[in-house]
Amino acid sequence: LPIRVAQFLHVVRGNPLKVARIHLGCVKCREIPKLLPHFHVSLQSGSESVLRRMGRRYTREKLCRLFRRIREMVPDAVLRTTVILGFPGETDQDFQQMLDFAEEIRFDHLGVFVYSDADDLASHRMRLHVPAGVAQDRYDQLMSAQMDIAAEKNQRRIGQTLQVLIEEDLGSSLFAGRTCFQAPEVDGVTYVSTASHAVPVAIGCFAQARINDAMEYDLIGEVA
């Protein structure tokens, strides 16, 4: 949609540090009024050693400083990242650093992927490939930690009234939609009930919903 008619804009791709800094400047200065304070910084790993093996040009410390700066300058910022577990050479210590990083930063949204090998990848020729079972166990541990973080953050939204883009009629006066901080396909949804209100709700339109319950990734509310 053109900026003049879009309700809000997400930035979801780009060089992690460069794009995030530009994005932060635009949000802080309100250069693009509809640009959301939602920062997708692709972390890849919270281990300095793994980042080097991946050939990344940024460090764990630079990422930490960036996230702290975002939170200081934009208190209501939403932080999103993606990481890869089981990259060749990743040790238990490397994974613990990643787990500690996630606990410290407390991302609003965290996408976790297990390394998938292929003959044409440069990493295919690296030593010390991580056994699939070990990588999966690390995935389970990190996702469990993130689930607790996400649940805590969602609990804080109970009592708030949020704008929700209605996307699906589930029947029985229940609709599913997304708030501005819930990206399509990858995040949770917000369920909106109209049972106790005669307020019309339409697919593709926005509705105000008061949040009265929360799950790990989804919110539950009623039209306000």
Residue ranges: model-predicted function:
Residues 1-25:
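Long, compositionally biased, helix-prone stretches
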Residues 2, 12, 16, 118, ...:
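Generic signature of intrinsically disordered, low-complexity, basic-rich segments
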Residues 4-8, 20, 31, 39, ...:
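Terminal low-complexity, poorly structured segments
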Residues 5, 39, 104, 190-193:
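Intrinsic disorder/low-complexity segments
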Residues 13, 21-108, 115-134:
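Conserved non-cysteine loop/helix-boundary elements of the Radical SAM core domain that shape
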Residues 39-41, 110, 164, 211:
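OB-fold and OB-like beta-barrel modules that bind single-stranded nucleic acids
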Residues 125-224:
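Terminal RNA-binding accessory module
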